[in-house]
Amino acid sequence: MENGLWEVLGSKGLLKKHEFIRILVQCLYSLGFKNSASCLEFESKILYKTADSEFLEKQVLSGNWDSCVQVLDRIFDNSMDDTRNTALYLVFKQCLLEYLKRGDVSLALNVLRKQAPLLRMGKEKIHRLACDIVYSKEMESGEVDNCLVLDLRRKLLVELEKLIPLPIVIPERRLEHLVETAVMDQIDTCMYHNSCDAVSLYKDHCCGRDQIPSETVQILVAHKNEVWFVQFSNSGKYLATASSDCTAIIWKVLDDNKVELKHTLESHQNPVSFVSWSPDDTKLLTCGNAEVLKLWDVDTGVLRHTFGNNNTGFTVSSCAWFPDSTRLVCGSSDPERGIVMWDTDGNEIKAWRGTRIPKVVDLAVTPDGESMITVFSDKEIRILNLETKVERVISEEQPITSLSISGDGKFFIVNLSCQEIHLWDLAGEWKQPLKFSGHRQSKYVIRSCFGGLDSSFIASGSEDSQVYIWNLKNTKPLEVLSGHSMTVNCVSWNPKNPRMLASASDDQTIRIWGPGKPNKPLN
């Protein structure tokens, strides 16, 4: 055993053999292979549990609190007084709880008087301990439940083991944690990782381009002019497109990921350049730079409402929903109209107008409904907390054409006419954005989006007729997808299928992209 303490494993000689065997034994026990674990302990003469940890476990589970205190005093040295006091506090709390639950009030008070000095507890801490016990759910009326008591003791043991210093106790499931950490490190360096499936331990992790949408699987032809906007619904079961032919189309995503036309929405008199799905996917908003805002029923394709007064030409450039699917907000390309919040019946709830409100380029509401992000024509991004009314302003140096929020609402991206996409954090901790480049944008409105597993990717259209994909860890393009013959105006990643992407182009088509071929060389 003494010699074994100095033996090492691995090609780098960094792994101590006795520690490696000990966590192997722990793993076998946790997986239920008790006989195998015991056999390994016998053969290696290396025990998973030390004498102190085994003794403590027995005392806790049997409720021998005096013995628990003694072993804890022995385990913690003078440099760990705070940790020792925390451990003793947990033990006394469980002890008092059990006495009070059984009705032994006098015994509980006696323990409190006797043991309080050990913890150097003042009146405040004693009062807190008493309150913790009296108001705990375990003190609810009813007979003493032995199963509950044993369960509470097991939980106490877990908490104590977190406090006990190494190597007396090994952290729970240590081998699983080490392996999982190693796998996660490999995943973090994998630019194509796009699946939550379990990974193989037989080889180092490395994904190919078959994990992301990089091949055209379907071309949708229904619009009669340029397609300016595309967006998957929140459930991923529908797709909406908007065109300069003055129509919008609702498409159905089938179970095999094929897409078919569901409704053509014909009521606009001018080009449609923006759509927005309600969070429950029952309603769709459509609008355009020279158009009014319209609300459609997704199931029937029927126009439910036209917002504003048509006679005054209340044009809307962008719109967004609140999480309840009953309120929406729209921004006008007319500065005098500003930003308006409506209900779905067309009643104005709130408006932001005045000289401080320039032309609205794009806007969005965070998934939690707490903040509204607005992009203005003066190169400003304003983030308004709708509850506190606190507003944060970000000034860009170049004109901004579009905005998109990540699925978790923590980040947003903006496309700039200088051929860059800027990634900002919503919390405002970053002083500078991450800048992604490689695509072409100088004359037209180009839109990008987050997508893939955990919003790990960005996709964007481009004036060179390509679709560009970046991994958030690299500001240079990961993939450049060819297929369209004219400017790609907008892209949308299916929020429920990380391997499905849609793109809309001036060539009057919508392309659906699926997983690429794993053996195809990268562009």
From Swiss-Prot:
One of its GO terms (cellular component) is cytoplasm. SUPFAM superfamilies: WD40 repeat-like. Residues 49-107 form the CTLH domain. Pfam families: LisH_WDR26, WD40. Residues 16-48 form the LisH domain. The keyword Nucleotide-binding does not apply. WD repeats lie at residues 222-261, 267-306, 310-353, 355-394, 395-434, 438-480, 483-523. It is found in: Cytoplasm. Keywords: Cytoplasm, Repeat, WD repeat. PROSITE patterns: CTLH, LISH, WD_REPEATS_1, WD_REPEATS_2, WD_REPEATS_REGION. Its main location: cytoplasm. SMART domains: CTLH, WD40. The keyword Cell membrane does not apply. InterPro entries: CTLH_C (IPR006595), G-protein_beta_WD-40_rep (IPR020472), LisH (IPR006594), WD40/YVTN_repeat-like_dom_sf (IPR015943), WD40_repeat_CS (IPR019775), WD40_repeat_dom_sf (IPR036322), WD40_rpt (IPR001680), WD_repeat-ST_regulator (IPR051350). Interacts with RANBPM. This is WD repeat-containing protein WDS homolog. It comes from Arabidopsis thaliana (Mouse-ear cress).
